[in-house]
UniProtKB/Swiss-Prot annotation:
Pfam families: Intron_maturas2 (PF01348), MatK_N (PF01824). This is Maturase K. HAMAP family: MatK (MF_01390). Its main location: plastid. GO terms for biological process: mRNA processing; RNA splicing; tRNA processing. Belongs to the intron maturase 2 family. MatK subfamily. GO terms for cellular component: chloroplast.
Length: 511
């Protein structure tokens, strides 16, 4: 009880974060401009008569949004462009985008202060070096060998815009900021409908990248909070493995917050989800929920998730978005790999005194295969080959210099090898390498108006071979396992490169 009371006092102190006045500070929009130019992902900022950022113009835009005629227009003409006023340049799309970036920076401040004020004794230093994408593959290789069923979840979105604002009310106790967020979101969608149009989501994400990520992470954080809370409360075993991959979610404090908000939550219903061994991994709008329980238990979790999204987030999700498969008999698409846990036969000769006999055993092995058909399809879409994998020239690159052509082909080839370096079978990679090599040769031959044979005889194939096998200096981790018995062909070396987050679009089919 004292623990909950202490947390309640901390929760009340969060109400002192009043971030609305920061929207009228010049340096906030300077940060937004610098983020757009120097961010990890380039943000396209629309120019507007070469006008500079100004908090005064943003203030005029906010006042315009709160005027009564603006409200009347938004109700009577929901599809009208309500922020654009071509007679006044400060109502253009440029300043609405700047307001979006500035608002995203401002609302992130309470979360940053909360993270900095976290007590040192509650930190878990051993998890700091695991918050990277390359740690997921060794995790799957070590844990999934002991599991039976896997649920492949497509995290649903669309979600009502009002729900997004209500989710932030638990974290941001600033009414003017929340009202401003409502007005701004009303620009993209009518309040009486869902964001069901993929076109609306695409434009909102493109024009307001930082705000979109903030809202999406808040929604996913809320969903994972309830999911993992029920999972942890339903088992006596610690759930350290799942917490490894949930960055900046503050799991322990959320559990306390849940106890205060919902004190009457009955533990009697938790037996329904009892599962002593379960692992959860989320990536790019999808999630994997693996378990050692029965198929009936997985169906219970599926029903729970569907009802949870329906009654808590107030929207219906299709049951087909959650696929339940048995690991031993199926494969799943994960981060550009086709992963599976097949049972490999192993023949062991055992000799006891004068008698010798053979023991036929089956061992599980986490297998990662390069999706050849999918990657060839993307190469075909990028006009490197035909749909059947036959290499063709790249006409759009013939205006470049020879070195630029070689550099582009070589970069794509190296990225493919770096990203799929942990594959258990490299034959598909060599096939892709052959397609890119011959496509490069055809492109150069087309530029110089000669045949591939004549071009290769003049330059020699050794130059292309040396270029494509050149390795960049990248940091990598090598995960090896020590076994008591070494069998021929039973040990394969896996290398997972650390630069696979920033990669060419071709090697990431999810983009």
């Amino acid at each position: 009880m004292e623990k909950f009371e202490g947390y309640s006092e901390k929760h009340k102190s969060r109400q002192q974060y009043f971030v609305y006045p920061l929207l009228f500070q010049e340096y906030i929009y300077a940060f937004a401009h610098d983020y757009g130019l120097n961010g990890s992902e380039p943000v396209e900022i629309v120019s507007c008569n070469n006008k500079k950022f100004s908090s005064l113009l943003v203030k005029r835009l906010i006042i315009r949004m709160y005027q009564q005629n603006f409200l009347d227009n938004s109700v009577n003409h929901p599809n009208q462009d309500r922020l654009l006023d071509y007679k006044n340049y400060f109502y253009s799309e440029f300043y609405s985008q700047i307001l979006s970036e500035g608002f995203a920076i401002v609302v992130e401040i309470p979360f940053s202060l909360r993270e900095l004020s976290c007590p040192k004794e509650k930190e878990i230093p051993k998890f700091q070096n695991l918050r990277s994408i390359h740690s997921i593959f060794p995790f799957l290789e070590d844990k999934f060998l002991h599991l039976d069923y896997l649920s492949h979840i497509e995290i649903p979105y669309p979600i009502h815009l009002e729900i997004l604002v209500q989710l932030l009310q638990y974290r941001i106790q600033d009414v003017p900021s929340l009202h401003l967020l409502r007005f701004f979101l009303n620009y993209y969608s009518n309040w009486n409908s869902f964001i069901t149009s993929m076109k609306s989501i695409f434009f909102f994400q493109k024009e307001n990248k930082r705000l979109f990520k903030f809202l999406y992470n808040s929604y996913v954080s809320e969903y994972e909070f309830f999911l993992l809370f029920l999972r942890k409360q339903s088992s006596c075993l610690p759930l350290a493995s799942s917490g490894t991959f949930l960055e900046r979610i503050h799991f322990s404090r959320k559990m306390e917050h849940f106890g205060i908000m919902y004190p009457g939550f009955s533990r009697k219903t938790l037996w329904f989800f009892m599962d002593p061994l379960m692992h959860y991994v989320r990536y790019q709008g999808k999630a994997i929920l693996a378990s050692k329980g029965s198929f009936f238990l997985k169906k219970k979790w599926k029903c729970y998730l569907i009802n949870f999204w329906q009654y808590y987030f107030f929207f219906w999700t299709q049951p087909r978005r959650i696929h339940i498969n048995q690991l031993a008999n199926s494969c799943f698409d994960f981060m550009g790999y086709l992963s599976s846990v097949p049972k490999s036969p192993l023949l062991v000769r055992n000799q006891m005194l004068e008698n010798s006999f053979l023991i036929d055993t089956r061992m599980k092995k986490f297998d990662t295969i390069v999706p050849a058909t999918l990657l060839i399809g993307y190469l075909s879409k990028a006009q490197f080959c035909t749909g059947s994998g036959h290499p063709i020239s790249k006409p759009i690159w013939t205006d470049l210099s020879d070195w630029d052509i070689l550099d582009r082909f070589g970069r794509i080839c190296r990225n493919l090898f770096h990203y799929h370096s942990g594959s258990s079978k490299k034959r598909t990679l060599y096939r892709l390498k052959y397609i890119l090599r011959l496509s490069c040769a055809r492109t150069l031959a087309r530029k110089h108006k000669s045949t591939v044979r004549t071009f290769m005889q003049r330059l020699g194939s050794a130059f292309l071979e040396e270029f494509f096998t050149e390795e960049e200096q990248v940091f990598s981790l090598m995960f090896t396992k020590t076994t008591l018995f070494s069998f021929s062909g039973s040990h394969t070396e896996r290398i997972w490169y650390l630069d696979i987050i920033r990669i060419n679009d071709l090697v990431n089919p999810l983009n």
